[in-house]
């Protein structure tokens, strides 16, 4: 289905380019008419409830109308929005002509939750598995306050809602964020807090503290994907099966390889008995291809735990750079 959609989009783009070159005046007139109509529209139309979607009039021949309907229906879902946005992802990053590896610049989680960040801080950033203290407010889409509290919890445990944990990731102490949590990410592990999973929610959160203060500095980590993303990404608190390989860059020595052991890893993103860099790399990854991560050895320590299920701390070259390769992803329900 995704290949079919990609083919349709490519055909539609080419069709419109040709049409634009042949009938430039018609397209300009159309733009003028649309702008005039838009300027004369009543402001009341913008106050329509998000649940009352306006009827869209489709023009053009049968092919154009059919493609338009497919695109419109796809864009009504979070998966569709992520898919269409990432079709253009290669344009946002350099491509290595040798292996077509794309450096990751696009944060799909910010897109998914429509995150806006305010203020600044110098302690952080928060990663999945950190223990954080936050003040949060949750409102419906009409800004009616539903819940507010100051709470301390482990990112990935989802005591309030899974989406909130993922909005906090990447924050510095003192920063504030606003976001919209899609209905499917309002699930939590609390019996005291219940949200209607048929609606989206607005959240505002202020990060007050992070423990322990072991951080992955984004400017010292390089992440590469060898396939274009076109699915909803993995999130903090979700479970995933995958293969991992750790290589010492200075001499090429393999320090860990799950494939050679014949057994994939089953991990909840945020598990503090795994290396911190694992949660950092998995959060926001789509389940395709191989993700390659170059990071300092110290980030391969388990977060806040002397138990490391992957590699013993005493054998880690903490001041050297290591290569982590993750692939064969399969989400565990």
From Swiss-Prot:
GO MF term list: peptidyl-prolyl cis-trans isomerase activity
Record keyword Nucleotide-binding present: no
Top-level taxonomic group: Bacteria
Gene Ontology biological process: protein folding
Reactions catalysed, as given in the entry: [protein]-peptidylproline (omega=180) = [protein]-peptidylproline (omega=0)
EC code(s) of this entry: 5.2.1.8
PPIase FKBP-type domain boundaries: 129-227
Location of the region described as Disordered in the Swiss-Prot/TrEMBL record: 29-51
InterPro entries reported in the protein's UniProt record: PPIase_dom_sf, PPIase_FKBP_dom
UniProt-listed Pfam families: FKBP_C (PF00254)
The keyword Isomerase appears for this protein: yes
Keywords: Isomerase, Rotamase
Name of the protein: Putative peptidyl-prolyl cis-trans isomerase RP395
Protein's organism: Rickettsia prowazekii (strain Madrid E)
């Amino acid at each position: 289905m995704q290949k079919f959609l990609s083919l349709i989009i490519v055909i539609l783009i080419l069709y419109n380019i040709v049409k634009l070159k042949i009938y430039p005046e018609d397209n300009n007139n159309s733009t003028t008419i649309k702008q005039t109509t838009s300027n004369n529209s009543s402001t009341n139309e913008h106050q329509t409830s998000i649940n009352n979607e306006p009827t869209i009039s489709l023009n053009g021949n049968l092919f154009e109308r059919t493609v338009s309907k497919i695109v419109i229906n796809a864009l009504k879902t979070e998966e569709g929005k992520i898919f269409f946005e990432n079709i253009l992802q290669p344009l946002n990053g350099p491509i290595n002509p040798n292996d077509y590896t794309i450096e990751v610049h696009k944060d799909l989680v910010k897109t998914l939750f429509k995150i806006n960040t305010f203020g600044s801080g110098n302690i952080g950033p928060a990663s999945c598995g950190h223990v954080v203290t936050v003040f949060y407010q949750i409102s419906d889409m009409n800004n009616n306050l539903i819940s507010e509290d100051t709470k301390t919890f482990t990112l990935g445990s989802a005591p309030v809602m899974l989406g909130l944990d993922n909005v906090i990731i990447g924050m510095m102490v003192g920063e504030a964020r606003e976001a919209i949590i899609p209905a499917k990410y309002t699930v939590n592990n609390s019996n005291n807090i219940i949200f209607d999973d048929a609606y989206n929610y607005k959240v505002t959160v202020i990060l007050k503290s992070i423990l322990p203060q072991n951080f992955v500095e984004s400017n010292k980590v390089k992440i590469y994907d060898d396939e274009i993303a076109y699915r909803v990404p993995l999130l903090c608190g979700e479970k995933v099966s995958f293969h991992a390989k750790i290589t010492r860059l200075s001499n090429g020595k393999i320090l860990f390889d799950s494939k050679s052991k014949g057994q994939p890893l089953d991990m909840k993103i945020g598990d503090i008995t795994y290396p911190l860099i694992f949660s950092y790399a998995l959060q926001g990854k789509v389940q395709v291809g191989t993700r390659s991560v170059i990071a300092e050895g110290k980030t391969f320590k388990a977060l806040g735990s002397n138990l490391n299920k992957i590699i013993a701390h005493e054998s880690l070259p903490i001041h050297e750079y290591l290569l982590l390769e993750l692939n064969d992803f399969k989400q565990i329900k």
